[in-house]
UniProtKB/Swiss-Prot annotation:
The modification Phosphothreonine is found at T69. The active site is at Y199. Its main location: mitochondrion. One of its GO terms (cellular component) is catalytic complex. InterPro entries: NAD(P)-bd_dom_sf (IPR036291), SDR_fam (IPR002347). GO terms for molecular function: 2,4-dienoyl-CoA reductase (NADPH) activity; identical protein binding; NADPH binding. Its EC number is 1.3.1.124. It comes from Rattus norvegicus. This is 2,4-dienoyl-CoA reductase [(3E)-enoyl-CoA-producing], mitochondrial. It holds the Pfam family adh_short_C2.
């Protein structure tokens, strides 16, 4: 899961330790809470409703893995509200059915739920056949199923490595190849979208299995963007930065210690929201993006460029300190 697929469910009106200014908004039946400590966040308010015109996906079929919660649920909600017939899949059928019923009642479009463990190629094969049976060949395929946990790499067991790579890399491959074969047979195109993470490109300590697997997912999608365009398929990638969802943060920031640090290194001054990611995802999967293929879109409020700049930490220097520094620089030889 992207180091952080998150906008988190909290049934609170105020936390015991008041974190400063807050924004509350609703998503489905849940209340989401987000800290907005950084003053500049007021310049970057999130838009929480679909940006595409109504019925942008009318008559289209969308298949979303990991569609029962978090980012997957948000993307499914937006696609359904824009007219798509959605089919969601994951291992937990009870959560899937509840989400499908919730979105169906909200949008008026039937959402189907299919239990699927993407680690099992036989189950993936049967799921794709059921998808085609209940809804037809998909026009949109979103590979969102993921798994992650933090651990020093020297503490990793072979099973820990295998658990993550089986879900993220192998699972994405099984779904993509199986659906691709069916689409080629039917002579039908589709838009594929993979949800990865900003550290798929840079790498990251303490999440090495996820970083490695997500990097593989990106290579896979870029390879297929080149190879399967001739069949009417295009492939794009979103690299989310910190988007707080309960599921991801329970494993990646279980103590809540790192959230403030995250916000401090995001130039936009806040975490992202699931709705913002859903807007980007629906655009990339829509006909409005028909000439976007093989793209990797970083969606992180500027976090990656801040972290990669050698001198970006100088933002903490005050005006008075800059006056002193400037005076010292002017006294150096060659100034």
């Amino acid at each position: 899961m992207a180091l952080l697929a998150r906008a988190f469910f909290a049934g609170v009106s105020r936390l015991p330790c008041d974190p400063g200014p807050q924004r509350f908004f609703s998503f489905g039946t849940k209340t989401l809470y987000q800290s907005i400590d950084a003053p500049q966040s007021k310049f970057f308010p999130p838009i929480l409703k679909p940006m595409l015109p109504p019925n942008a996906f009318q008559g289209k079929v969308a298949f979303i893995t990991g569609g029962g919660t978090g980012l997957g649920k948000a993307m499914t909600t937006f696609l359904s509200s824009l007219g798509a017939q959605c089919v969601i899949a994951s291992r937990n059928i009870d959560v899937l059915k509840a989400t499908a019923e919730e979105i169906t009642s909200k949008t008026g479009n039937k959402v189907y739920a299919i239990r699927c463990d993407v680690r099992d190629p036989d189950m993936v094969h049967n799921t794709v056949l059921e998808l085609i049976k209940v809804a037809g060949h998909p026009d949109v395929v979103i590979n969102n199923a993921a798994g992650n946990f933090i651990s020093p790499s020297e503490r990793l067991s072979p099973n820990g490595w295998k658990t993550i790579t089986d879900i993220v890399l192998n699972g994405t491959a099984y779904v993509t190849i199986e659906i691709g074969k069916q689409l080629i047979k039917a002579q039908k195109g589709a838009a594929f979208l993979a949800i990865t993470t900003i550290y798929a490109e840079s790498g990251s300590g303490f999440v090495m299995p996820s970083s490695s697997a997500k990097s593989g997912v990106e290579a896979m999608n870029k390879s297929l963007a080149a190879e399967w365009g001739r069949y009417g398929m295009r492939f794009n990638i979103i690299q989310p930065g910190p988007i707080k969802t309960k599921g991801a943060f329970s494993r990646l920031d279980p103590t809540g210690k790192f959230e403030k640090d995250m916000i401090e290194r995001i130039p936009c001054g806040r975490l992202g929201t699931v709705e913002e990611l859903a807007n980007l995802a629906t655009f990339l999967c829509s006909d409005y993006a028909s000439w976007i293929n093989g793209a990797v879109i970083r969606f992180d409020g500027g976090e990656e460029v801040f972290l990669s700049g050698e001198f970006n930490s100088l933002k903490k220097v005050t005006k008075e300190e800059w006056d002193v520094i400037e005076g010292l620089i002017r006294k150096t030889k060659g100034s």
